[in-house]
Amino acid sequence: MEKRELGTLGVSGIGLGTLRAFDVTEESDLVTRRQIIENCISAKINFIDSAAAYGAAEKAVGIATEGIRDKFYLATKVRIEGKEAGERQILQSFENFNTGYIDLLQIHNMIDYQTHLPTLERLQDEGKIGMIGVTAMVVEAYPAIMDLMRFGRIDTVQIPYNVVQREVEAELLPLAEELGTGVMVMEPLKKGRFVKELKGEPDLTPLKELGIQTWAQALLAWVVADSRVSITIPATSRPERIAENALAGSLDPMPQELRDYVREETVRLL
């Protein structure tokens, strides 16, 4: 799989998200998550994104990566108000991951970001985290995010970007390209909606020449065809999905006419 730049890291174009999919505690479920992680290694996926707010997901990642931590870059998020509460939550993330170093620590949905940024900068200076990022679900947060980008206070942004949600194309993606800010894409499949909730079967015929076999691959390939995107992080609870998702990051870039087709076909069937 092609490696891309996410700040100072060389990451796989397709990563692994853990929202809901890794919020598990039962032994049988943890065994399945270990298989997912092992499949990631086979598929050359080297980046895992989690969050303190994802229930048991951080701890499940820590268990599933035991003994193979060096195969992955780990990212998580702080989501709470208050300096001391934030510090406690971050400390818990280190414990959940069972690690002394986190490659990327993000401020989840920009919650109390002005309070948490100095904490993350201190941790970065102490060598406990590698990079600082922010995430946001809504366009109203983009002006503040772009200010942080311009002032050099963050290394990465994580935003939704897919065939329907394209607001980032207007200003945020061009600025990220100009400044070299890493771009992580959440919700490339809109939590599976663009695959599971279509009114009919999309026509894959025009995409077969690229090697695309499923609509999920088409949607992921649509995202990573934008060279300003560093990585997209679909979540899954099914080990067999890893190879399917990873293929989208191993294909030749989708040409613009096929990107238009994927977008139009998705919108037609929603």
Features from the language model and the residues they span:
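N-terminal binding-site loop/beta-alpha segment at the start of enzyme catalytic domains
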Residues: 1-72
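Conserved, mostly hydrophobic/aromatic
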Residues: 6, 16, 48, 61, ...
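Glycine/proline-rich, positively charged
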Residues: 24-25, 38, 80-167, 171, ...
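Structural motif corresponding to the early beta-alpha repeats
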Residues: 52-53, 67, 71-85, 109
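Short, electropositive alpha-helical surface patch
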Residues: 62-75, 243-251
